[in-house]
Amino acid sequence: MNEVKQFIKKFIPLPSKKGEDLYKLTIDKMAEIEARKTPKAMLDYEVQLVEHCNLNCKYCAHFCPVAPESFLDVNEYEKDCKRLSELFDKEVNFIRLMGGEPLLHPKIADFCYITRKYFPNGIIDLDTNGILILSMKNTFWKALRENNINLTVTRYPLKLDVQKIKEKCEKENVKFRFFFEEPVKTFNLLPLDLEGRQQPEKNFYKCYLANSCHTLKNGKMYTCSTVPHIQHFINHFKCDLHICENDGIDIYKVKSKEEILDFLAKPIPFCRYCNIDKRQTRKWETSDKKIEEWT
């Protein structure tokens, strides 16, 4: 990297403020690319316990507004969790239990116990929009507390009793934080190219989801959260987007953790459907379930 920095300095004069800013921007972008194509040292993943949501944000990257009501099977998750635990010797960096809205799952406590059983040392977060927190049963709070699971709330422009939520978590001795201190005001529109005309490698290196939002779904690991949930979009809008075998890696066919980590750090065929250069920030709203929210 130092040799590259010296090479760049030959073309970007540093004495001016503009030159310094351009140099820093270039180095930062190169560092992002390097991070995306470098396999992680440890496992991290997110898993969607519920496909649907009780909020349904416009531009939702998990396509929850157009997803049918669906709950992750506890036994299937335990099977996958056990397999990953075997491959990674029970070591994990962090795990995110999410949705959809995970608090909608009637067996949410089971997922807390299962995840901690197979990964005793890693960080485990349960991500929620907070709407149902104050209505959760004692078994929920006990599961979080006994398994050292952090309750993470993303605040939206809703009437949530923030103080009561904080007090409840303190009373239950559950670790709690807001994902952002202020309510979300904007959402990212991540448009799809329905013709699949984009360059997969270029997209991968420019995408903040790539080799970051690792997702476990139905016995496979994915480099991002788009592919494992895109079927909801395809089914709802009757689109002909092709998902192939090589878009994810089967955790039961690999022989080592390195195979998984290496796969997650590489572009996949489905990357051609993401229109990275057209991504925009939009005002947060609830979904109208129109195709324009994702194209």
Question: Where are the predicted features?
Answer:
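Short, flexible coil/linker elements and helix-boundary hinge sites characteristic
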Residues: 1, 10-17, 89, 148, ...
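Accessory C-terminal segments flanking Radical SAM cores
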Residues: 192-295
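Exposed alpha-helical structural elements
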Residues: 3, 7, 76, 83, ...
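Soluble or luminal CAZymes and related metallo-dependent hydrolases
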Residues: 72-76, 107, 161, 199, ...
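Conserved AdoMet/S-adenosylmethionine-binding subsite of the radical SAM
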Residues: 104-227, 232-233
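Conserved alpha-helical substructure of the radical SAM core
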Residues: 7-9, 18-126, 133
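Flexible, charged surface loops at secondary-structure boundaries
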Residues: 88-90, 144-146, 265
